[in-house]
Amino acid sequence: TDMSGMFQAAISFNQDISSWNTAAVVNMDQMFMNAYVFNQDINTNGNSWNTSSVTSMEYMFFNAFAFNGNITSWNTASVTGMYRMFEDANQGVPSSSFNQDISSWNTAAVTSMERMFFNAFAFNQDISPWNTTAVISMANMFNGATSFNQPLTHNGNSWNLANVTNMTNMFTGATAFSTANYDIFLYSQANNVATNSNITINVSSNYSDATSRTYLTGTKSWNITDLGNTASVAPT
């Protein structure tokens, strides 16, 4: 039931473990933490590991620089913790490789996405369909994720931030995050009645939707630090 730390610091491990029966496993925390070269397909004949019982994946691929396996079809319905799951703590030396489609993951039970993609330089996938209703912390979620540039709105519906209390440095250093996608984020949250109040968020982008931003900083009492309105940016 417990695979936590199983290959932690196994710096040379890169074997095929695709056929494992993981149906009863509850804890995968730190499983491949600092497993620098591991990059195996965790599938058997097209079938991925059974992760339906897993409740925690915190630090699972922390500093697993080489890993870029297909984990698209994982069942994450029971997972509550994804804290620092794909974090590259060494700031890209070497850089994190993970950039797989995980848009279909069921994240309805997840309470922490803090530092999930911290310094995950390669990651740039659409995760707008995720259910974030239970999430409490998104602090540093994309901090240093220099490739990430996706809208966090799916079929006109924004992420539900009703229970989020901490978004500090969420997009700090996410330098690819465009004004267009930042505007989408501002607009969708300003027009979502579920959006929580008194949020602090840092974004390394300019905005052009001053109306939505003003609503969030005023009516919702958000404390937003960003690169300013594009209208005030001097041409180069």
Identify the residue ranges that each predicted region occupies.
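Negatively charged
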Residues: T1-T236
